[in-house]
Regions:
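Predominantly soluble domains enriched in secretory-pathway, periplasmic, or organellar proteins
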Residues: 1-233
């Protein structure tokens, strides 16, 4: 076990150009931290404080940089993976809370899932940030994956308890294919392109009612109920 932070570790992503793992700690405070973990040394080798309240999982671009959704700030930023210098910042109309990212490298498209009163998926040029398409999606999306083999997007919703499949007709045109039922609270997802399997973790929970002091209390998860549901092609 390697100590990283006190709490609220959000995700860990391997960055191939540096050979390091970037670990996200989004604390919902005024600042969040990106940690650099060196697998060869098996230790944390760097920590970078950002003036961001909540950082969702980053997306490695593949050119030595990575995209970072900033949900509370309403932005998508791109950083250098070696220096952590800010390279780009994009804001999209009708996207108040960007929460999940995926990409189509072949057709140079960035997919941005946006939370809000009218949730949407933004399809943007991966180099310029220009919006190419937009379509409505389910609520509170926390993960998106692009299946290059079938040219399909996979979009889970833990609130609506489903997995939406969206077909890519061409780089800028998309259509919903189907909605597959999942478990409540199955927000997060891992997609294995080799086996074409989708993995959705979830737990049983109790949702406390809102109070005068807390409009949206955190759910209370039940012990020994963690599961991973697997979907095949």
């Amino acid at each position: 076990r390697i100590p990283v932070a006190q709490s609220n570790l959000n995700s860990a992503v391997y960055e191939p150009s540096t050979g390091k793992v970037i670990i996200v700690s989004g604390r919902r405070a005024d600042r969040s931290t990106l940690f650099e973990f060196d697998p060869k040394q098996e230790r944390i080798t760097g920590a970078h404080e950002l003036a961001v309240k909540k950082i969702d999982p980053l997306l490695v671009k593949g050119d030595g940089s990575f995209f970072l959704p900033m949900r509370d700030e309403g932005k998508v930023a791109r950083y250098s993976a070696s220096t952590f210098a800010l390279l780009d910042t994009w804001q999209f109309a009708d996207c108040p809370k960007p929460s999940a990212l995926a990409q189509d490298v072949t057709r140079q498209r960035l997919f941005v899932a946006c939370r809000g009163e009218s949730p949407v998926l933004i399809v943007a040029d991966r180099e310029t940030g220009e919006v190419k398409a937009k379509l409505p999606i389910t609520r509170d999306v926390n993960a998106v994956a692009y299946d290059d083999q079938h040219r399909r997007l996979l979009i889970p919703s833990g609130v609506d308890a489903n997995l939406t499949l969206v077909d890519q007709q061409d780089a800028d045109h998309y259509a919903v294919r189907a909605s597959v039922s999942t478990l409540p609270m199955a927000y997060n997802m891992a997609f294995d392109p080799a086996s074409q399997r989708v993995f959705l973790p979830a737990m049983d929970f109790t949702q406390p009612a809102p109070t005068k002091t807390e409009a949206k209390p955190d759910p209370l998860f039940h012990a020994n109920t963690f599961s991973v549901t697997t979907y095949g092609p």
